[in-house]
Structure formats: structure tokens, C-alpha cells
């Protein structure tokens, strides 16, 4: 299969973290102890929203200390807590604007055949969903990650992998 999805944790009590293809981390709501075995493989972290089961400040801080070149992708509302609480340098944060630029394609992993886009999700706080596209290789395909939402855009049919978390 072209996509390998490892669910590190997906429960409200233990937090949420999903590793796609062994190096794309979606959400970081788990303890450092749970994430540490995967930390050196992660190349990019996608954050959805501020709730603690998706955004564990202590774990993000430790991940940033352990992997100082690692970058975090998020919407504008998460920049302040990333910088002030998790102590992630501003230059390590990649900003997406799902409400202003829905579907805009980003090439955050330069030199690869992987692109991604974000979309707005309905929740009680600002929330972002992600679409990752692998255009090259033997098995190209597209995956979506959405969490804690009341609906998924109808514009998301025809994907190869749907990762939907809700608890």
C-alpha cells in the first residue's frame, strides 16, 4: 500500500497522534513517553486545534527540544500557544489559512512528491483538516485527516485514505 497509517493513540483520555508514512505526524496530544519512540522519524507536524487531547504543550515543547529543525504546520490561532507555551521558534511554524485559501496546495517537504492542503472544520474552536497528496512513486494517492468535527466537506470524495478521529 502506498500509505502507512500508524495510530499512536486515538482516545480522548490518552490523546491523539497519527503517523502517516512513518514521518508525517497529525496532532500531538499524547505524552512524550508515548511519542518518544517515533520522534526521530517525524519530518513534519500537522496540528488541528488547541484542545489538549490534540495539542499537548509539554510534548510539543519536548519534541521541539529533541528535534530543533522540525517544523509545525498550523492555522494562525495556534501560533501564540506554540511560541509562548511550547517555545517553538516562529521560524519553525508554517502557516496555513484554510478559511482564506481553501484547497491551496503547499509544498512544505521540498524535494519530495508530497504536497498538502488544509480545510476548515466545524468545531467549538478553530479546527483544521488536512489533505496529503503523493503524486509520484509506484502508488500515488491522496489521504485526508479530519478530527472533532460535525461535518466533512462534500468536496472530499475520491480520496484513497480517510482518517477521521472523533471522541
Per-range role (PLM):
Residues 1-40, 128-148, 161:
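Conserved beta-strand hairpin/beta-sheet module of binuclear metal-dependent hydrolase folds
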Residues 74-140:
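Metallo-beta-lactamase
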Amino acid at each position: 500500500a502506498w500509505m502507512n497509517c500508524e495510530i499512536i493513540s486515538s482516545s480522548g483520555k490518552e490523546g491523539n497522534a497519527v503517523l502517516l508514512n512513518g514521518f508525517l505526524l497529525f496532532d500531538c496530544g499524547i505524552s512524550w513517553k508515548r511519542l518518544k519512540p517515533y520522534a526521530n522519524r517525524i519530518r513534519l507536524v500537522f496540528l488541528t486545534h488547541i484542545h489538549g487531547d490534540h495539542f499537548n504543550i509539554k510534548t510539543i515543547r519536548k519534541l521541539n527540544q529533541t528535534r530543533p529543525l522540525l517544523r509545525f504546520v498550523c492555522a494562525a490561532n495556534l501560533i501564540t500557544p506554540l511560541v509562548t507555551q511550547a517555545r517553538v521558534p516562529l521560524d519553525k511554524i508554517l502557516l496555513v489559512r484554510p478559511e482564506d485559501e481553501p484547497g491551496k496546495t503547499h509544498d512544505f517537504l521540498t524535494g519530495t512528491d508530497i504536497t498538502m492542503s488544509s480545510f476548515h472544520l466545524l468545531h467549538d474552536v478553530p479546527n483544521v483538516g488536512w489533505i496529503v497528496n503523493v503524486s509520484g512513486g509506484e502508488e500515488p494517492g491522496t489521504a485526508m485527516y479530519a478530527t472533532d468535527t460535525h461535518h466533512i466537506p462534500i468536496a472530499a470524495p475520491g480520496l484513497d485514505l480517510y482518517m477521521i478521529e472523533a471522541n
